[in-house]
């Protein structure tokens, strides 16, 4: 029979939640221990740090700038490159966002924008800083 003792277990960055009810130990011979862990679904998830209305406005601007066909889904995780955008298209998207939200985006920040969520998060940050 195998036994395991310990005082503490810690993880630097949890990847999945584990249901302790499904944790089991077994061993056929001395020195052999088997550990079976079953992941459980997370109860909540943060999908986007930007405000939903900002994400929706960014989606509209991206669809307009890239002439995205009707019925094509554009959401927070959509990459501009997946919609066929090149670097010039991205610059035009940023210019449209600056005009819509009355903000100014630094070139280094603009280069870091790859998804709708990236743009929306940056916009919320700049709008908050502007109103402070």
Curated annotation (Swiss-Prot):
Modified residues (O-(pantetheine 4'-phosphoryl)serine): 87
MF terms in GO: acyl carrier activity
One term under GO cellular component: chloroplast
Family matches, as InterPro entries: ACP (IPR003231), ACP-like_sf (IPR036736), ACP_chloroplastic (IPR044813), PP-bd_ACP (IPR009081), Ppantetheine_attach_site (IPR006162)
Location within or outside the cell: Plastid, Chloroplast
Stretches that traverse the bilayer: none
SUPFAM superfamilies xrefs: ACP-like (SSF47336)
One Pfam family recorded for the sequence: PP-binding
Keywords noted in UniProt: Chloroplast, Fatty acid biosynthesis, Fatty acid metabolism, Lipid biosynthesis, Lipid metabolism, Phosphopantetheine, Phosphoprotein, Plastid, Transit peptide
Transit peptide start and end: 1-49
PTM comment text: 4'-phosphopantetheine is transferred from CoA to a specific serine of apo-ACP by acpS. This modification is essential for activity because fatty acids are bound in thioester linkage to the sulfhydryl of the prosthetic group.
Pathway in which the depicted protein is active: Lipid metabolism; fatty acid biosynthesis
Top-level taxon in the UniProt lineage: Eukaryota
Domain Carrier: 52-127
Keyword Transmembrane helix on entry: no
Function: Carrier of the growing fatty acid chain in fatty acid biosynthesis.
Family indicated by similarity: Belongs to the acyl carrier protein (ACP) family.
The protein's name: Acyl carrier protein 3, chloroplastic
Naturally occurring in which organism (per UniProt): Hordeum vulgare (Barley)
GN (gene name): ACL1.3
């Amino acid at each position: 029979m195998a036994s395991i003792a310990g005082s503490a277990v810690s993880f630097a960055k949890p990847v999945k939640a584990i249901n302790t009810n499904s944790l089991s130990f077994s061993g056929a011979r001395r020195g052999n221990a088997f550990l079976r862990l079953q992941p459980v679904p997370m109860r909540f998830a943060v999908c986007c740090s930007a405000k939903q209305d900002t994400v929706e406005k960014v989606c509209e601007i991206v669809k307009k700038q890239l002439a995205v066909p009707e019925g094509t889904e554009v959401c927070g995780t959509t990459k501009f490159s997946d919609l066929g955008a090149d670097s010039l298209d991205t610059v035009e998207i940023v210019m449209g966002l600056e005009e819509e939200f009355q903000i100014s985006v630094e070139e280094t920040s603009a280069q870091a924008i790859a998804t709708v969520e990236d743009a929306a998060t940056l916009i919320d940050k700049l709008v908050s800083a502007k109103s402070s």
